Design a protein with these regions (language model features):
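Short beta-strand elements of ligand-binding domains
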Residues: 108, 135-139
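Short, structured coil segments at secondary-structure junctions
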Residues: 123, 131-132
């Protein structure tokens, strides 16, 4: 199997970051590049500056990805790229997989039981339906690599 590029879509949640460990293991085994993606979709209230809101969303996505790269620095031997997509997460993931010529997409989903296990997460299912790139769906029962402290989320919440 040839794996040159592994796309890992992230939404800022620990659930999504649950896929990082698997992506890192595969990248090390196959010498692949990890491409971290964060979709930046600004939601604005009527009368708000949509351009400024989108610029803020992109900046926050870039800061988040930089923090993930710093946390991965002691674990990843190979190359890590970051990309910010604009728009909805599923569409940005499908587009990034095509543009970057990804060989694999690694995503996480809830570890549900019963009827819930029959349905993947909404974004994961949309990506699965929208791409021909193979997808490894990881059940995110565990913490991500070097979990963040939560300070960034607390700071963001204080500005609401």
């Amino acid at each position: 199997m040839k794996l040159g590029k592994i796309l890992v879509p992230l939404d800022g949640s620990m659930l999504a970051e649950g896929a990082l460990s698997n992506a890192v293991d595969l990248a090390e085994k196959y010498g692949a590049t990890i491409s971290l993606l964060r979709a930046a979709e600004a939601f604005t209230m009527p009368g708000a500056d949509a351009v400024e809101a989108q610029a803020t969303a992109v900046r926050e996505a870039e800061e988040y990805l930089a923090a993930v790269v710093r946390r991965l620095a002691n674990r990843v031997i190979g190359r890590v790229e970051t990309h910010v997509g604009c728009g909805a997460a599923a569409a940005a993931s499908v587009e990034a997989a095509a543009v970057q010529k990804a060989d694999l997409i690694v995503m996480s989903t809830h570890g549900r039981s019963g009827l819930g296990r029959l349905v993947l997460g909404r974004v994961t299912e949309s990506v699965l339906r929208g791409t021909t790139v193979p997808i490894l769906v990881v059940r995110a029962d565990h913490a991500p690599l070097d979990a963040p402290s939560g300070a960034r989320q607390a700071e963001r919440a204080s500005h609401v």
